[in-house]
């Protein structure tokens, strides 16, 4: 039987790690957008090598399950970083001394970079190229025309997908308990082990994820309305 009196206690236990989960997701999506934008701009050109290279990169992260990506990074990254850390610190750093957080961040940044590069590339292509040409014809430099005319419109087109993948990353972070990083799911698992409760902590975890999604969606909708109210719209 489910003891509903345990749910508030489990929710409070899980709530302690919510800021950490949100931060990990934010860092992942932020750098994913940053690097994805760079890749998207590069792929707008006609360089066959660049297009093939990044097409393979995107294809890999779209096809391979997140848990497999995480394990590949987790078991290989410490052996790559240990010599670097040793060189900078002047002391020997062994692979198992490298924090698993590095693996989590790298894995999810690469994951978001792959998806956001496609999202941003599509958004850039959705902007009428005639606006860019008209701006250049009026005396704007190519860079200024791109950053002042094309980029703001593409940003608004891509914005919903940014938020969608932020929520998706929050949920995917439930995988990180497998590499000894504590997130919301891991916290529920710890509660289950500590108090020998099998159902309540996971129901509380589901409520926490659901409530968080509702709150973040509301905040995003309000922010998007403000942006559109300031003239940031798809037809700008």
Region locations from a protein language model:
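Transmembrane alpha-helices and adjacent helix-loop boundaries
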Residues: 1-236
């Amino acid at each position: 039987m489910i003891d509903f009196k345990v749910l508030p206690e489990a929710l409070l236990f899980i709530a302690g790690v919510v800021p950490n989960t949100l931060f990990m997701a934010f860092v992942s999506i932020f750098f994913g957008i940053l690097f994805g934008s760079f890749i998207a701009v590069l792929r707008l050109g006609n360089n066959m090598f660049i297009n093939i290279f990044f097409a393979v990169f995107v294809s890999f992260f779209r096809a391979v399950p997140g848990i497999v990506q995480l394990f590949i990074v987790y078991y290989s990254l410490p052996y790559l970083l240990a010599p670097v850390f040793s060189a900078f610190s002047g002391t020997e750093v062994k692979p198992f001394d490298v924090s698993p957080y590095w693996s989590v961040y790298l894995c999810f940044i690469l994951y978001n970079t792959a998806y956001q590069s496609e999202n941003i590339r599509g958004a850039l292509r959705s902007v009428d190229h005639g606006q860019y040409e008209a701006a250049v014809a009026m005396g704007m430099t190519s860079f200024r025309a791109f950053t002042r005319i094309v980029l703001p419109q593409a940003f608004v087109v891509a914005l919903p997908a940014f938020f969608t993948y932020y929520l998706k990353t929050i949920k995917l972070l439930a995988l990180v308990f497998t590499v000894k990083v504590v997130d919301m799911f891991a916290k529920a698992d710890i509660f289950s082990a500590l108090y020998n409760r099998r159902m309540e902590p996971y129901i509380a975890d589901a409520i926490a994820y659901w409530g968080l999604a509702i709150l973040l969606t509301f905040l995003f909708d309000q922010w998007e309305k403000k942006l559109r109210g300031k003239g940031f719209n798809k037809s700008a």
